[in-house]
């Protein structure tokens, strides 16, 4: 994994600031992203891991947009971002799992918290960019009963798509939907970040529909 190449690619895109454009498309943020930890149990719990360098527990693009969409479609959704141990640093992309062990363990602890604190909740999840690696790392290590409570997972710009053969290991493939834009090279085993990697806000409505369709 070429971290220097990743850094240069991100630097080349900074002037265009595509993440900021995504924020302008979906400026409303209805959640601080800590509703599982600090709120009441809801019928649905949404756990999300943001992209590298994004601020806030849900990030500033696909995370809050998908949270908002789910809240609009359903009565009772708790949105929870992975953090603060998951720091979404650029350097973590170059680690063997595409993210840090601390991030993976924190995500696992949130899935466990959802099941223990809110035994009747249905869990859905998502990740964007490095956040997809968090989900690829976290979900296979959960016990089977907890995996059964996870009804659907959506992954945007999946940095582990090629490595894991378009699926999350040891998790039903029909519960997963992976969004890889044409020309997004991170989906093909590289750390080359180009403009298509910042296009996933357009897939949020379809992703929300997919997650809603998986609920019982």
UniProtKB/Swiss-Prot annotation:
Its EC number is 3.1.1.74. Keywords: Disulfide bond, Hydrolase, Secreted, Serine esterase, Signal. Disulfide bonds join 41-118, 67-79, 180-187. SMART domains: Cutinase (SM01110). It catalyses: cutin + H2O = cutin monomers. InterPro entries: AB_hydrolase_fold, Cutinase/axe, CUTINASE_1, CUTINASE_2, Cutinase_monf. The keyword Coiled coil does not apply. It holds the Pfam family Cutinase. Residues 1-16 form the signal peptide. GO terms for molecular function: cutinase activity. The record marks 52, 130 as: Transition state stabilizer. The keyword NAD does not apply. The active site is at 129 (nucleophile), 184, 197 (proton donor/acceptor). It is found in: Secreted. GO terms for biological process: carbohydrate catabolic process. PANTHER family: CUTINASE 1-RELATED, CUTINASE 2-RELATED. Catalyzes the hydrolysis of complex carboxylic polyesters found in the cell wall of plants. Degrades cutin, a macromolecule that forms the structure of the plant cuticle. Belongs to the cutinase family. This is Probable cutinase 2. It comes from Aspergillus terreus (strain NIH 2624 / FGSC A1156).
